[in-house]
Design a protein with these regions (language model features):
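Histidine-centered phosphotransfer motif of kinases
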Residues: 102-109
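Membrane-anchoring alpha-helices and their flanking helix-loop junctions
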Residues: 2-97, 109-182
Length: 182
């Protein structure tokens, strides 16, 4: 037997492991850092006592739960399609399935919902300001960097996608979805 197939399998496993670690790090860096660590550490989220009779608290818990479920669905979509990264900075393919059929930025939207839920749990002006800064910063990043990079990389397919799928507000999918990657 030639050592080449074993070396090829090892190389593939190493690349897959490396990409998985990178994806996991990105997962921790974006949602974990911005929606988890910062509010927990610097805005007092760790001191919140949820009052089940408080409608604002119930709405906050619902927003966090929806954000977490949507975020999980996004990551599962990437994993299911064996996409090599979860980072928005180097997408290998244009993802238009799953939640991406309805909204172009479901990961950012999910994190925004989670932080909004945290705002509803607390009466913190600092956390409200943080949420507003997060939302503005994400918009600027998406519009000034990510969308431009995706237009350069995917051309007409991305332009068609943008024409039918909202950046932040979900839209009903059209029949055109099947031709976006062509």
């Amino acid at each position: 037997m030639s050592p080449v197939p074993a070396a090829g399998i090892f190389l593939q496993m190493t690349m897959t492991s490396s990409l998985a670690v990178r994806g996991l790090l990105w997962t921790i860096l974006l949602p974990g850092f911005f929606a988890g660590f910062l509010p927990w550490r610097y805005f007092g989220l760790r001191n919140v006592v949820i009052d089940g009779g408080n409608p604002r608290h119930l709405l906050g818990v619902a927003a966090i739960a929806i954000g977490v479920v949507l975020l999980g669905a996004c990551f599962l979509e990437f994993a299911r399609r064996a996409i090599r990264t979860l980072a928005p900075v180097d997408p290998p393919v244009l993802v238009v399935q799953g939640l991406y059929r309805y909204v172009r930025n479901p990961v950012y939207l999910s994190v925004t919902l989670i932080v909004l839920g945290e705002v509803l749990l607390m009466r913190s002006m600092a956390l409200r300001a943080y949420w507003a800064v997060w939302f503005v910063a994400v918009n600027l990043f998406v519009i000034r960097y990510e969308e431009r990079a995706l237009r350069r990389r995917f051309g007409r397919a991305y332009l068609r996608y943008c024409a039918t799928v909202g950046r932040w507000l979900p839209r009903r999918p059209t029949q055109e979805h099947s031709g976006w990657n062509s």
